[in-house]
Amino acid sequence: MTTAILERLSTLSMSGQQLRRLPKILEEGLPKMPCTVPETDVPQLFREPYIHAGYRPTGHEWRYYFFSLFQKHNEVVNVWTHLLAALAVLLRFWAFVEAGALQWASPHTLPLLLFILSSITYLTCSLLAHLLQSKSELSHYTFYFVDYVGVSVYQYGSALAHFFYSSDQAWYELFWIFFLPAAAFCGWLSCAGCCYAKYRYRRPYPVMRKICQVVPAGLAFVLDISPVAHRVALCHLAGCQEQAAWYHTLQILFFLVSAYFFSCPVPEKYFPGSCDIVGHGHQIFHAFLSVCTLSQLEAILLDYQGRHEIFLQRHGPLSVYSACLSFFVLAACSAATATLLRHKVKDRLIKKDS
């Protein structure tokens, strides 16, 4: 018995030693990674206010930027927050499907599927932008334009889900005619405004750049959240008992907090150079936007299950199909806008280098 116990302890000790060596083994298994550099060693385009170090050097092979997912630099938290959020969305939706709650053959399910697609799209586009933008100036513009297309798609995917599953009758009777066309236009305008601001203004960025980004995105949010905000307000005034309404409330609160950190460079403004790797405002923005999306997903899944009869009373298959088709039209228009401005950026960079 004593011998068996000692053998087991020896095995556990060896396992502990192997676990402690795991980070070193992983590091040795990866290609040799260039060290990060200070802001003075990267072009002006890549520098962020109050972030003094942790930049990845430009001009390396694509492999380096993909493997930088496992390197300590000033974008890695931005990448991982949205990577983990995308995995969480997929796992939560998979659990929902496994529970038998999804009606695959029903038009009732299409807006939910598009919302899941839009959520994964914006999270993936965002993490790719932060992971790969450092390769070159053209890559920087290209991947951020892709990011803006993802945001536009997510805005309209949210609008579809809120319209079909979450709106109450009083709001629906007032706004049903023009809500989706207006949401599609605001989604495209948000993408166009962000792409134009990125193309037009150079560092150090003027206030007008932030206005071009924030105002269209703010309009899109106010419109897209209006069915939810109306329902949540009425619910809380009546002593809210709906679980979905509480998740919608969290969604709104998390988004407002994330919007603040997107708009204001805090806390790095007050601690320059101390938040280079962890703790700067854009990372906090990513974290709150991720939990906003997860709260929104929970609310929409509850509405999908609990408000099925309301959906059937309001919407026929044709209206659902046409609304869902508009999702792909918006995605195409946003992608075309981003592509056009990318060509303009490419021409400008060619002229600069010639």
From Swiss-Prot:
Its biological purpose: Plasma membrane progesterone (P4) receptor coupled to G proteins. Seems to act through a G(i) mediated pathway. May be involved in oocyte maturation. Also binds dehydroepiandrosterone (DHEA), pregnanolone, pregnenolone and allopregnanolone.
Database matches in Pfam families: HlyIII
GO (cellular component) term, any one: Golgi apparatus
Side of membrane Extracellular, spans: 98-111, 195-213, 265-283, 337-354
Note: Non-classical progesterone receptors involved in extranuclear signaling are classified in 2 groups: the class II progestin and adipoQ receptor (PAQR) family (also called mPRs) (PAQR5, PAQR6, PAQR7, PAQR8 and PAQR9) and the b5-like heme/steroid-binding protein family (also called MAPRs) (PGRMC1, PGRMC2, NENF and CYB5D2).
Residue ranges annotated as Cytoplasmic topological domain: 1-76, 133-173, 235-243, 305-315
Family per similarity comment: Belongs to the ADIPOR family.
Cellular compartments annotated: Cell membrane
Name under which the protein is recorded: Membrane progestin receptor beta
GO biological process terms on file: oogenesis
Membrane-protein topology: Multi-pass membrane protein
Entry keyword annotation includes ATP-binding: no
Expression across tissues: Expressed in brain and testis.
GO molecular function: steroid binding
UniProt keyword list: Cell membrane, Developmental protein, Differentiation, Lipid-binding, Membrane, Oogenesis, Receptor, Steroid-binding, Transmembrane, Transmembrane helix
Residue ranges of the TM segments: 77-97, 112-132, 174-194, 214-234, 244-264, 284-304, 316-336
